[in-house]
Amino acid sequence: MTQAPPVATTPRNYPIFTVRWLALHTLGIPTVFFLGALAAMQFIRR
């Protein structure tokens, strides 16, 4: 990935809960959970 220009990389304490973090996790966590549930269902034999 390309690095940001040196002007924007001033050392500071970056927040964890950004809009990008929120968007990635609200989409990613249910997707991973759903894929895990589908994978687990493949091994269920009734």
Swiss-Prot record:
With its partner (PsbE) binds heme. PSII binds additional chlorophylls, carotenoids and specific lipids. It comes from the Bacteria. Heme binds at H25. It is a single-pass membrane protein. GO terms for cellular component: photosystem II reaction center; plasma membrane-derived thylakoid membrane. HAMAP family: PSII_PsbF (MF_00643). One of its GO terms (biological process) is photosynthetic electron transport chain. Its cofactor is heme b. It holds the Pfam family Cytochrom_B559. This is Cytochrome b559 subunit beta.
